[in-house]
Amino acid sequence: MTARVLMVQGTSSSAGKSLIVAGLCRLYARRGFRVAPFKSQNMALNSYATPDGREIGRAQALQAEAAGVPPHVDMNPILLKPTGEAGSQVVLLGRPLGVYKPANYYALKEKLWPLAAAALDRLRADADLVFAEGAGSPAEINLRPHDIANMEVALYAGASVLLVGDIERGGVFASLLGTMELLAERERELVAGFVVNKFRGDEELLRPGLALIGARTGRPVLGVLPYLHDLHLDEEDSVGLSGRGKAPAPGDLAVAVIRLPRISNYTDFLPLETENGVALCYVDRPQELDGAHAVILPGSKETLADLAWLRRRGLDRALRDFAARGKPLLGICGGFQMLGRTIREGGQTVAGLGLLPVRTRFASEKRTVQVRGVTAEGVWGIPGGLSVRGYEIHRGFSEVCGGRPCFLLGGQGTGLAPEGCAAEEGYVAGTYLHGCFDSDTYRTQWIAAVRRLAGLPARPSEQPGFAARRQRDLDRIADLLAERIGVERLDGILGL
């Protein structure tokens, strides 16, 4: 039997669609249904390497985790990775298709939509339920003629739609009513009801507005969801970095992550950010490095452009000074490339920061793979042989001309090989390994090593492991949906 589809759309970006879909996946997977997530087109710089070496949006990987199934390219057949003014890299079914400007991409969509629809068909053939996520808003007038991420999906699948509004940013009633007004009649007919998300305060104060929404649209407000604090779950958009981070308390380890304009896969740092005794913040000014015990130079979608940005901001000198003071500096993926001696792309060779004996060249082929292995000996006092796993997504290939490896890694069916580079003197290191801090033992030992180097007393972690924290939070969202919307109500919308 073909799976039933329920779609979650929003009145804006960051309304909470991704986590609501994740919660629905967990809620119904716990009840024994075969569940799959779906998002036809996703725009994000935080991506994920699937077990078969393909690339999808990070949110769909999280939703697959919530559903208890392996992530697959059919869950996110089209991924757009912004590259700045040039447009976006289009990743089709997990493989890079090319970089397209908006006008060219709109013409391409006529060919892409059948492929996205076929991916949804394959998911429906193997599942009982598919929970689909929209993108942005379904009522953007300038985008509607080319929108294959919202109502086009719902109409194709005959899916009921939950429309989510973010009350935290204000204007939720106007946004819900305005969205309904701008939809075509056949699209409005698919909307089963509304969800007000991220509410803080006394829900009784909302009653008049909720009643008005119901009276004006003929659809109920299905539930009001509170703002959830302390979630250990991924976000996709760098807008999520606004206001992130905290000031260190006495005895905390202060970690500064450089907020590159084209930062990618900053989900790498969520395990550190949510660790007790660690104060992680995102910085973009040289003076903000002064109080840091360690600095991380993260991944970038455009390494050379972000390297030029570092130099314009004076952060190149600040990072060299930081390293010269014997403080730990770690580069991941694009950050690793920037720490090296040179970066070559086409006929252009650009000097790196010169802190690691590494030369990088960019190539057309892209490496996308899940890997596992162990730590190498002698890096910052971190013990060798610690289990670690993660993934690589990069187009550059680096030649290491000295130093020592950070890890010994292997992909599926391969032996362990040296990976990354740590300077022989000082505490500068770099790696292509995304997700290394998800590994509890490595993260704990990395924190302990940096605390020692900073002269801070040891502080054992008393938290559950990061994976356990994620599972707890997915259950927390599922429980909230069951409480605030109701399982019977959701079953009715699904036709169960």
Curated annotation (Swiss-Prot):
GO molecular function: ABC-type vitamin B12 transporter activity; catalytic activity
Residues forming the catalytic site: C333, H434
InterPro entries: Class_I_gatase-like (IPR029062), CobQ/CobB/MinD/ParA_Nub-bd_dom (IPR002586), CobQ_GATase1 (IPR033949), CobQ_N (IPR047045), CobQ_synth (IPR004459), GATase_3 (IPR011698), P-loop_NTPase (IPR027417)
Highest taxon in the source lineage: Bacteria
Location of the GATase cobBQ-type domain: 252-442
Keyword Transmembrane annotated: no
One Gene Ontology biological process: cobalamin biosynthetic process
Keyword annotations from UniProtKB, A to Z: Cobalamin biosynthesis, Glutamine amidotransferase
Pathway: Cofactor biosynthesis; adenosylcobalamin biosynthesis
Function in brief: Catalyzes amidations at positions B, D, E, and G on adenosylcobyrinic A,C-diamide. NH(2) groups are provided by glutamine, and one molecule of ATP is hydrogenolyzed for each amidation.
Protein family: Belongs to the CobB/CobQ family. CobQ subfamily.
Name used for this protein in its record: Cobyric acid synthase
Organism name: Desulforudis audaxviator (strain MP104C)
Record lineage: Bacteria, Bacillati, Bacillota, Clostridia, Thermoanaerobacterales
Gene: cobQ
